[in-house]
Amino acid sequence: MGTPYHLGIDVGGTKVAFRVESGSACIEETSFSWGARHSAEDDLAQLAGHVARLRERIGTPLEAVGVAMPGTVGADGRVATWPSRPEWTGVDLKTALHSLFPEAAVAWADDGDLGALAESRASGCENLLYIGIGTGIGGGLVLGGVPCPGLGRGSFEIGHVIVEMGGVRCVCGRRGCLQALASGPATLRRASLLRGADVTYYRLQRALRNGEPWAADALEGSTRALAAAVTGVQELVHPDRVLIGGGFAAGIPEIVPSVSGFLADLVRQGQAPLPVEPAALGGLSSLRGAVALAGLVAAGEVP
């Protein structure tokens, strides 16, 4: 019998990515974009179709499947909230996944937690804070090589840490969450207000390269908030470094040095600012983490 096949799935608000590994070798990597939003049933049918085609290509049963989820999944296996696709609320994820992969051991976890796990393994750093900036803000904390608070014990929701009392309303219903101030859409909204005209992602990239003041000010509003959140985590658990990734951050290299500068401003006497680096895996952190989760569940390390 050959080396078992493990599948990682990164479920996003706009697309779903898949990676099949055998040992350390990548067998297949593919993705699809969600169709028009109608119902969770339509989404699950689209997912099932892609899985069926993937199975045909690899031609080998799967030993284990790990799934990175952006929404909140309750202990009963049902989706409690997913702001990007609210029609998934109440979906029995556990049953749906076992129907798709009846022969495999299956587990799921927060996409930010899995991103942190993958980055920890890729960098060789056992104590790190990972922040993924995209449509929202996810993140994860790894201490001693283990995700914190722990798989199955809830997610590390740094995107919903409050950094500005009475600030902008977040999709979660509170005000002043990091996500409401520093996510990709939040940064673009601030940039549009400062410029006095709509700003796209590519327009912001170009303006930052050209040193346009409105672009720099828009980004600083986000990186100040990020530095405040990171400082709070540093005071509590003392990670060795911060890695910043996600699709939005991957294309704006100015984020990392800006956060680093504000962290230096916030440091207390006798305390060193945390090193800030770009995520080693870029926008693939959660997908690689999902594959790692499949390996853990296959080894019996995840119930």
Swiss-Prot record:
Q: Give the EC number.
A: 2.7.1.179
Q: What class of enzyme is it?
A: transferase
Which molecular function GO terms apply here? ATP binding; kinase activity; phosphotransferase activity, alcohol group as acceptor
Catalytic reaction list: kanosamine + ATP = D-kanosamine 6-phosphate + ADP + H(+)
Q: How is its activity regulated?
A: Inhibited by Zn(2+), Cu(2+), and Fe(2+).
Question: What SUPFAM superfamilies has UniProt attached to this entry?
Answer: Actin-like ATPase domain (SSF53067)
Q: What is this protein called?
A: Kanosamine kinase
